[in-house]
Every structure is written in structure tokens, then in C-alpha cells.
């Protein structure tokens, strides 16, 4: 079954729909420059209302390790996603402080980027660029057999095709389930339904 991650969750209205469709993961974005940024306090409130079957992923860009450890310790997030240029030393230091899975996001623009992918974390995510809403050249994935989350430019218009062609471990969507910058309940329901439809047909 293809795992589903809905990223950029910001409001209690979003959580209500999430609890209805029950994706595997949601993403709280803690990168200050992102238009989907939320504070730690807001994330705490939203997590308290989230169905326990859905795991909350904290998305960070070069964040202070102590802040991440605080969020994990207080169970505001269940998984850590690193979306900056965090190096091996950073990852090892973070691993020593937390005991939850990590996702490392790679921006894929060339074959060289694919070759640079490492397995230093439990999961990897392949994206065209943080929050850009664009897809990357699928030909770059030829011969790549690691499990990964597919992100970048996914929507209700292309998700079935992407899953059938690329067979990712999971899919990660944000802008593709939004209308005018806000999460769209109808698009969320449709996206989740389409992913599960593909899985049921295989």
C-alpha cells in the first residue's frame, strides 16, 4: 500500500478532514520562510486533536537540534523530516538525542543528485525543490531502486499515473491539495481516494 503524507497542515479545519480520511502522515512545517509555517504552540494544539492513527511529521530546514528534540520529547511530532542542507554530523548528533524515525529530503535536478542519495535516515524523500510544486524528470529515477517518498507537483490530476509508473513507497503532497493557498477539503478527499484506488486495482 502506498503511504500517504499530506503536508503543510495549519488549521483545525484541516485536522477535521485529516481525521476523516486518515492518511498515514501529516506534515507540520517549521521552516520560518515557508508560507505554510506554523509555530510550535499551534502544532501542539493541532496534534492534540489529531487521530492517533495518523503520524505527525515535523518538517525542518537547518533547525536547532534542541528545538527538534523538544518537539519529539513532548510528542508534538512523531517523525522528523530534514529539508535543508543538514550534514552527516548534524544527523548523527540528532540521532543521539531522539528515538523517532527521520526522513531526509533530496532535491532532484540531475543524475548527480540521485547518485548523492544516502541511507543515513529511515526514509528518504525525493523532491523537485522545497515547496515549489514542480515535478522532476522521471528519467532520472532509472535504475534507482531505494524506497522513497515522491514529492513535487503531485495533484489529483496526475497522482494515479505517477504511482503506476514509479511505484514509490509513499507520496507527499501540499500545494496539490490547496486552492488559493489554503487546504481544500474536497481535493484532500479526492487525492487520498485516488491513491487508495490505485492500490486496490493492483
Label the model's feature ranges.
Residues 1-126, 131-202:
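Conserved N-terminal beta1-alpha1 strand-loop-helix module at the mouth
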Amino acid at each position: 500500500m502506498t503511504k500517504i503524507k499530506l503536508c503543510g497542515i495549519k488549521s483545525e479545519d484541516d485536522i477535521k478532514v485529516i481525521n476523516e480520511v486518515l492518511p498515514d502522515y501529516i506534515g507540520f512545517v517549521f521552516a520560518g520562510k515557508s508560507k505554510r509555517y506554523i509555530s510550535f504552540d499551534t502544532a501542539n494544539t493541532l496534534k492534540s486533536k489529531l487521530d492517533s492513527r495518523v503520524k505527525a511529521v515535523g518538517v525542518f530546514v537547518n533547525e536547532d537540534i534542541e528545538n527538534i528534540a523538544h518537539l519529539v520529547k513532548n510528542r508534538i511530532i512523531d517523525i522528523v523530516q530534514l529539508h535543508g542542507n543538514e550534514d552527516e554530523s548534524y544527523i548523527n548528533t540528532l540521532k543521539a538525542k531522539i528515538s523517532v524515525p527521520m526522513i531526509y529530503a533530496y532535491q532532484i535536478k540531475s543524475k548527480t543528485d540521485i547518485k548523492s542519495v544516502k541511507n543515513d535516515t529511515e526514509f528518504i524523500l525525493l523532491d523537485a525543490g522545497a515547496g515549489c510544486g514542480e515535478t522532476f524528470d522521471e528519467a532520472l529515477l532509472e535504475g534507482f531502486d531505494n524506497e522513497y517518498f515522491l514529492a513535487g507537483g503531485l495533484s489529483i490530476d496526475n497522482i494515479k499515473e505517477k504511482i503506476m509508473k514509479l511505484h514509490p513507497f509513499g507520496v507527499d503532497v501540499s500545494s496539490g491539495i490547496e486552492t488559493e493557498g489554503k487546504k481544500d477539503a474536497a481535493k484532500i478527499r479526492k487525492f487520498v481516494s485516488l491513491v487508495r484506488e490505485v492500490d486496490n486495482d493492483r
